[in-house]
């Protein structure tokens, strides 16, 4: 299934039903009073989060949504039926933005959570309500109100505890496959990962969610490559793993590669740059010898002061220990 994380849709809530003008007319009640009922309220439109939905693809092809109108009132004080509400099912982590103001107006962050997008029109009232001591046969009623109209943008930001960041072919997809049951495509060419992937990492009785996004390249903050579009999925992560290929197949410099990604991250968002971040040195199985020494030299060259981990995602070496350390960090953050 294609991954879609941003769509624009048009919403029209239902119109309220009109009130009714009617008078009681029975064989032995020739001068019965007013008995016109109220109309029904128009239907509203809601977002509803569903943990089993992973993309906004359904809203890519259908862009306009209408809730049901309320029915008009009837005689004998019968109220019109209210218009049925419409629920748009979206992934957990979906935000809503008003197209006119570009301001965020709501979000759904938990399974089953709802958010009202547009309100249905209020019902009209029947002539029964206008009876008075001076007007026993009112012909006055009110029309139902129009439903609210709005054009909105839906944005999906994946809800992950840990997000993987790095250049294409750094081994992020292999890492998430090695520690979870996620199955992103893996191959030796750039941008194997075209869309984000989520994997649940289990550590004993605990578990956390890891996200793999397409690799970041130089110029991503200005729109180069695929990274810019998907960097937003890191914003809700509790920590970021910067995955570095210590032995690039294209013989590029790991030090330069590290700083290229860090630079793009800072340019994109200072808030994202300030998130807790850990260094993961991957593909140590490709180093001929002196693995620890070469990794230490790399860390010193980039001036890294935090925790770092050396792994071979392909050989599943060091990945269990990495998962345990991440789980410990996340448990402390709760």
Swiss-Prot record:
**Cited SUPFAM superfamilies:** Obg GTP-binding protein N-terminal domain, P-loop containing nucleoside triphosphate hydrolases
Q: Which domain of life is it from?
A: Bacteria
Q: What is its main location?
A: cytoplasm
**Residues the entry annotates as binding GTP:** 166-173, 191-195, 212-215, 282-285, 312-314
Assembly behavior: Monomer.
NCBIfam families (UniProt xref): Obg_CgtA (TIGR02729), PRK12297.1 (NF008955), PRK12299.1 (NF008956)
Stated name of the protein: GTPase Obg
Source species taxonomy? Bacteria, Pseudomonadati, Pseudomonadota, Gammaproteobacteria, Thiotrichales
The gene designation is obg
């Amino acid at each position: 299934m294609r991954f879609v994380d941003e769509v624009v849709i048009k919403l029209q809530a239902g119109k309220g039903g009109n009130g009714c003008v009617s008078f009681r007319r029975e064989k032995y009640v020739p001068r019965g009073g007013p008995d016109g009922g109220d109309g029904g309220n128009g239907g509203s439109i809601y977002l509803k989060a569903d943990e089993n939905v992973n993309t906004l693809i359904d809203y890519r092809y259908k862009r306009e949504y209408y809730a049901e109108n309320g029915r008009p009132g009837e005689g004998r004080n019968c109220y019109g039926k209210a218009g049925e509400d419409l629920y748009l099912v979206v992934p957990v982590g979906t935000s809503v933005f008003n197209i006119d103001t570009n301001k965020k107006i709501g979000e759904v962050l938990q399974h089953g959570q709802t958010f009202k997008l547009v309100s249905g029109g209020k019902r009209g009232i029947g002539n029964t309500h206008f009876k008075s001591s001076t007007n026993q046969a009112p012909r006055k009623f009110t029309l139902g109100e129009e439903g609210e109209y709005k054009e909105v943008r839906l944005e999906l930001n994946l809800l992950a505890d840990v997000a993987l960041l790095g250049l294409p072919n750094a081994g992020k997809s292999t890492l998430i496959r090695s520690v979870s049951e996620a199955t992103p495509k893996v191959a030796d060419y750039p941008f194997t990962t075209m869309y984000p992937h989520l994997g649940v990492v289990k550590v004993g009785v605990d578990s956390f969610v890891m996200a793999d996004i397409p690799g970041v390249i130089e110029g991503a903050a200005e729109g180069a490559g695929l990274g810019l579009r998907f960097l937003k999925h890191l914003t809700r992560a509790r920590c970021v793993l910067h995955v570095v290929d210590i032995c690039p197949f294209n013989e590029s410099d790991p030090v330069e590669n590290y700083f290229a990604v860090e630079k793009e991250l800072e340019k994109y968002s200072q808030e994202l740059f300030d998130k807790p971040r850990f260094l993961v040195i991957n593909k140590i199985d490709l180093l001929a010898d002196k693995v620890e020494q070469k990794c230490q030299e790399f860390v010193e060259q980039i001036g890294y002061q935090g925790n770092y981990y050396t792994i071979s995602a392909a050989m599943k070496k060091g990945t269990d220990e990495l998962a345990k350390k991440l789980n410990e960090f996340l448990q402390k953050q709760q």
